[in-house]
Structures are given as C-alpha cells and as structure tokens.
C-alpha cells in the first residue's frame, strides 16, 4: 500500500486536486511550476526514507467562532491527500452508519438537512406531531480529542502501512496527548471516525431509528420523553469514555411541537405534516452586518460593487434551501437602501468601515431602518 500511495502517479494526481482554487497563492505557484520535478523528488524521498513532514503554521479563524487552525505546507498537503484518497478515507468510512453525514463523498450539510426532513415526514406518518428531540453538541470537540483514541481507531480500521503513515503525520504536526486544530483533511477524517462506535451503539443497542450525527452535533427523534432522557443519559456516559463533554447550552431535550434548530436552519412540523424550514436569525444578522461593511468599502472605491452582489447571491443560494422568501425580500430591500445611502448616509463607525480608524458615530438612522424591516 505504501508503494501505491507514494507512487509518482498517485502523488501527481493528488497535486492536481490540491491546487484547485488556490493556484494564485505563491507557494502553490512555486510548487506547480516545477510540479513534475517536485513530485519525482517526493517519490524518491519516500523510497530512500529521507522524507520529513513539514511544520504547520497556526492561523486564526474568526467566523463562525474564534478558533485556531493549521496551515500546512503544500508539499505536505499533496502527500496527505494521497494517503487520504488512496487508503485512509476508503478504509475508515467503510463501516460508517448512513446517518453519519459530515465530510464524505455524496454527503454534507445538504444531505443532512434532506435526511432531517425525510425522518420528520416518516415519523409524522407513523406517530403524528407528538415526539421528542434530543440534541447533543460536544464542547471543544477537536481540542479535546485524545491522540491515543484517534490512533487506536485508525489502527483498528486500516492496514499497517496506512496506520504508520497517518499516525506519523499526526504525531509530527500535533504535539502533546490531546487536541487537534482543524485545517487538514486527515484531521477531518479523524473527527468523523472517532465517534463511529457511538453511532453504532445508538443504532444497535439503543435501537434509535431516527438519528443523525454531523461531526460533533447529534440529532435524535424519539416517541416519548422517557426514551429521550434515556438516550440523552447514555450518550453522556459514552462521551465520558472518550474524555469528551457536552456543551450545556446546546445540548437539550425539546418537544417536537416546539421546533428545533439544526445546521443553521429552524425546523417546525405543522399539524398537517408540513415541514417549515427557515434560516436562523443569527445568519440574517451576520449578513446585514457584512453588507454594511462591504457597501461602505464599495462606496469608498475599495471594493468592486460586483463583489458585493457575488457575496449576497451566495448567501441567498444558501437561504433558498429553506422557506426564506420573505427574509430574502427584506434583505434585498435592505441592500438597496444601503446603496442609496438612505439609512446611513456618510455616517460610519468602526464596525461599518472594517476598522478604518474612524470614531463611532450615532446609529439612530440604522436602528430606525432595521426597525422598519
């Protein structure tokens, strides 16, 4: 397996995948410009044992929450992509449950949302609107993953060569015994794999029919509150085995009739069986703040107007996945008024001008406009 992963063809194909969308970056340009020579050098280094994993750089991510991630050298990204695509991913995901929805080919947020609606409709046809939702969110999932647990999972599910190469990369890039910073595909695979035994436990031991896990977010639908409390308690016990704990604010049991929030959308099941799926209010608020900053930059000539439209169209495409017609109409009107200057005029504050250094000004016009919408 090692010979296949480090072969010229495998590494070259991995380079072609890794460069998509990032060829404008200088390190990528430099590597790809002499791609054949660099790939051949990598191949020989793996053959004669002189290959060394590079040191990643820490970068700060601020949205949707502040956290640290790792930026990996391009040559290491090529090598890791070859491991993932040719061996690690196929072997690790082979035993996943259908309801494990994150970071897999043919799956993702859209798949998970569709599965939620499918489960809700199936449940409604059997039991109506009476039911209970169990939601569990793990606090600091990546930062609290034990290295020994991840390596044990890889060792149990993959061949010897894949285990040695994968664990070697993780050990070189992450010091200590606990915690991984997101930023590489290999860490994502570790994230979706670590709790695979818990997925099977929920399905096969607790006999839960309607359950979904998206990375560290659990969504479970059961018939009675007693069942919900039992499932919730068992999940808490299982998480302790992995040294993980639930986020108290985001982990709870709620009646199905009250609705719930999952993956950025609010869901509500009506008495007639209709599933109402609306965009989370936090997303709308964030979009409005972003539009204020971008429009002001555009008015100062620092940003092309087309970039504002491109950003907003992307947000609308996501909103279209739910019942968001009225929200879209209000946001479009808000954007038009921003461009006309009816709400803000020349008044700008630090948050509106992306840190331009100006002092804060009264926001009465802005508050009045938001009240109207």
Q: Can you say where each PLM-predicted feature lies in the sequence?
A:
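Right-hand nucleic-acid polymerase module
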Residues: 72-73, 77, 81, 172-176, ...
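Short Gly/Ser/Thr- and Asp/Glu-enriched loop/turn motifs at secondary-structure junctions
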Residues: 56, 212-216, 248-249
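PAPS/PAP-binding and catalytic site of the sulfotransferase fold
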Residues: 83-86, 235, 239
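Beta-rich nucleic-acid/ligand-interaction surfaces
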Residues: 102-111, 219-221, 253-259
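Surface-exposed helix-capping loop/turn segments at secondary-structure junctions
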Residues: 93-94, 204-210, 243-247
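Conserved polymerase palm-domain catalytic core
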Residues: 45, 114-215, 219-238, 254
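Short, residue-level hotspots on alpha-helical faces of the histone-fold
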Residues: 81, 85, 192-197, 250
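Conserved two-metal-ion catalytic palm core of "right-hand" nucleic acid polymerases
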Residues: 1-150, 158, 170-174, 365, ...
């Amino acid at each position: 397996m090692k010979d296949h992963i480090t072969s010229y063809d495998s590494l070259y194909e991995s380079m072609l995948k890794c460069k998509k969308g990032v060829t404008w970056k200088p390190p990528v340009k430099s590597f790809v410009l002499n791609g054949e020579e660099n790939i051949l050098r990598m191949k020989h280094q793996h053959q004669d044992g002189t290959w060394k994993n590079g040191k990643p750089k820490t970068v700060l991510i601020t949205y949707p929450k502040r956290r640290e991630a790792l930026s990996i050298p391009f040559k290491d990204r090529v090598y890791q992509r070859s491991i993932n695509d040719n061996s690690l991913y196929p072997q690790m995901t082979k035993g996943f449950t259908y309801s494990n929805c994150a970071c897999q080919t043919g799956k993702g947020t859209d798949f998970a949302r569709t599965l939620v609606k499918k489960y809700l409709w199936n449940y409604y046809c059997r039991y109506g609107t009476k039911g209970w939702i169990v939601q569990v969110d793990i606090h600091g999932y990546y930062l609290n993953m034990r290295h020994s647990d991840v390596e044990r999972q890889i060792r149990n599910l993959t061949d010897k060569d894949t285990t040695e190469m994968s664990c070697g990369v993780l050990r070189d890039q992450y010091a200590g015994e606990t915690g991984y910073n997101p930023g590489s595909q290999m860490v994502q695979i570790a994230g979706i794999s670590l709790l695979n035994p818990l997925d099977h436990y929920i399905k096969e031991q607790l006999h839960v029919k309607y359950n979904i896990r998206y990375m560290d977010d659990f969504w479970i639908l059961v018939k009675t509150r007693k069942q919900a409390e039992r499932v919730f308690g068992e999940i808490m016990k299982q998480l302790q085995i992995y040294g993980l704990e639930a986020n108290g604010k985001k982990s709870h049991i709620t009646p199905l009739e009250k609705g719930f929030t999952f993956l950025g959308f609010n869901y509500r099941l009506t008495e007639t069986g209709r599933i109402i799926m609306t965009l989370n209010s936090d997303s709308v608020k964030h979009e409005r703040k972003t539009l204020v900053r971008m429009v002001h930059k555009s008015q100062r000539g620092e940003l092309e107007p087309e970039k504002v439209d491109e950003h907003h169209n992307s947000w609308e495409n996501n909103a279209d996945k739910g019942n968001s017609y009225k929200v879209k109409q209000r946001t479009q009107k808000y954007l038009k008024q921003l461009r006309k200057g009816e709400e803000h005029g020349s008044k700008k504050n630090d948050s509106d001008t992306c840190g331009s250094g100006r002092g804060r000004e009264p926001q009465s016009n802005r508050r009045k406009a938001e009240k109207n919408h």
